[in-house]
């Protein structure tokens, strides 16, 4: 069957979306309960049961949620456990993690590798995920802020997105993960972001 290597079916962003659209649960189509299935709701953010049934109905057998914060890993596992029919996992967000950036700034690759190995084991994640590496940290201190390129230094750490990407990729490759690092580069979706 098919493998969806990038979806959003568990974790805080999904639950926030469900809370933002409560009217959908009253008006959207439902998945009826049968002798073999649980009921579920559809809409823009389906219930866990409906998600599993729809994926298997489209021919998918595996799905990976692409963005779970480490502190939300346990709840994401509970949601995925509630999603039937398919194999599933998730990627752990690390691209703006303070400990990651501090380890890189202090030029301690062994400390970074040990931390990532511990974090992946503690969260039981499938791969580390980088989203706008360093850019989110800049935004935290200046709501209109971001990094303009992969070579702009990140406030308070003095590391660049390029250093975050290369160091996390190196550490993940050393771990021998089946999917070493999943990257959403800086300025994704903006013209000229390939530069």
Would you name each region that the model predicts?
Residues 75, 107-195:
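Histidine/acidic residue-rich metal-binding segments in metalloenzymes
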Residues 2-80:
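Metal-associated gating/positioning segment near the N- to mid-region
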Residues 8-10, 68, 93-97, 131-135, ...:
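Active-site beta-loop-alpha junctions enriched in small/polar residues
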Residues 57, 82-85, 122-125:
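Alpha-helix termination/capping residues and helix-transition junctions
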Residues 69-115:
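Mid-domain alpha/beta scaffold segments of enzyme catalytic cores
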Residues 65, 99-100, 138-140:
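A generic structural signal for short coil/turn motifs at secondary-structure boundaries
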Residues 3-7, 63-65, 88-93, 126-130, ...:
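Hydrophobic faces of well-ordered beta-strands that scaffold small-molecule active sites
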Residues 20-42, 102-111, 142-159:
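Charged, glycine/proline-rich intrinsically disordered loops and linkers
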């Amino acid at each position: 069957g098919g493998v969806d290597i990038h979806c959003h079916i568990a974790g805080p962003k999904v639950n926030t979306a469900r809370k933002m659209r409560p009217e959908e649960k009253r008006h959207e189509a439902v998945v009826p309960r049968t002798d073999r299935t649980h009921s579920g709701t559809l809409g823009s953010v389906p219930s866990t049961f409906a998600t599993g049934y729809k994926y298997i109905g489209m021919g998918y057998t595996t799905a990976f949620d692409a963005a779970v914060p480490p502190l939300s890993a346990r709840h994401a596992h509970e949601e995925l456990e509630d999603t039937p029919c398919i194999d599933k996992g998730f990627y752990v967000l690390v691209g703006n993690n303070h400990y990651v950036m501090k380890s890189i700034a202090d030029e301690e690759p062994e400390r970074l590798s040990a931390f990532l190995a511990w974090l992946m084991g503690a969260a039981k994640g499938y791969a580390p995920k980088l989203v706008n590496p360093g850019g989110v940290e800049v935004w935290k201190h200046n709501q209109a802020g971001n990094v303009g390129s992969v070579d702009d230094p990140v406030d308070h750490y003095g590391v660049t997105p390029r250093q975050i990407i290369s160091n996390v990729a190196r550490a993940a490759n050393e771990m021998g993960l089946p999917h070493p690092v999943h990257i959403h580069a800086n300025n994704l979706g903006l013209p000229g972001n390939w530069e």
